[in-house]
């Protein structure tokens, strides 16, 4: 059975998923030589970096990125668009690109 879900509803689902799977995110200034004043990272309670906002790009922890692709059955472009909307909703920053953080 297929359902039609609005984009706003999907952003809310991503909101709930991140809250349930990652927990509360804490914002820290980005400690990088080329970081702008507005750049930062979002870490979970254990201190692991989940998102990095650097030079208008949003880096997403690789395992989380892959899980979200699979769980929501999205392609990369669709996930990038949703994460961009989620980020703008919560952190009011302009995102030009979204990418997995590969370590």
What does each of the following model-derived ranges do?
Residues 94:
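Positively charged interface segments
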Residues 21-30:
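Short, charged/polar N-terminal "headpieces" of proteins
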Residues 1-18:
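Short acidic, low-complexity intrinsically disordered linear motifs used
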Residues 7, 20, 42-45:
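Intrinsically disordered, low-complexity segments enriched in Ser/Pro/Gly/Ala and basic residues
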Residues 3-6, 97-103:
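Short acidic DE-rich linear segments
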Residues 32-89:
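Acidic, low-complexity, intrinsically disordered interaction modules
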